[in-house]
Regions:
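An exposed, glycine/acidic-rich loop-and-rim segment of catalytic or binding clefts
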Residues: 1-181
Length: 181
């Protein structure tokens, strides 16, 4: 069973610039994975429409982060997996996630061949790790966008498989493009 990803935190404002709550985020996903009280997906694949999980049109990360919505209450913010529209095994898709800083014009656009993105707004980060200037990161000062298979896939038969047969090669693709607009 293999489900590798990258857990980099992004803050397009730059180092020592505070929270990412005003960063507009857009995700090409009309579905997401509800979680239980231990942050594990329940197996349900739910619609984003009409919920704080709807990022099909760009909106500030902080707009709905404190909404009275059980999945956000469990983790004190975002920490869920979004299911990409039109995913097919082995098919690379461009422009799946876009993160912006409108003040600087910096834009991060991500593509992948993975079926989803786990998006975590550093809700429980409290003083570690240290940033590039040696200052501890604080809560919601970065957002991790992890292109990956769905968490707990081996235990959810309706999720895409993460099984890798012995002797087979594992490969996935994630592309980060940076622009200034």
């Amino acid at each position: 069973v293999v489900n590798l990803t990258n857990h980099a935190y992004w803050n397009l404002h730059g180092a020592d610039s505070g929270k990412i709550l005003d960063h507009p985020l857009k995700v090409k996903a009309s579905k997401w994975l509800p979680i239980d009280g231990t942050h594990i997906p329940t197996g349900e694949i739910a619609d984003v429409e009409g919920t704080p999980m709807d990022f099909r049109l760009a909106k500030a990360i902080g707009r709905d982060i404190n909404a009275d919505f059980p999945p956000l209450n469990i983790g004190a913010g975002y920490g869920q997996c979004w299911v990409f529209d039109d995913w097919e095994p082995g098919k690379f898709q461009e422009n799946l996630v876009e993160l912006r800083d409108d003040a600087s014009g910096r834009v991060l656009i991500m593509g992948s061949d993975q079926p989803g993105a786990q998006i975590y707004t550093a809700n429980r980060v409290t003083g570690t790790p240290l940033n590039c200037s040696g200052r501890p990161y604080g809560q919601q000062e970065g957002v991790a966008i992890e292109m990956q298979h769905f968490p707990d896939s081996p235990n959810k038969p309706n999720f895409p498989s993460t099984f890798l047969p012995a002797g087979k090669k594992y490969e996935n693709h994630i592309v980060w493009r940076f622009l200034v607009k």
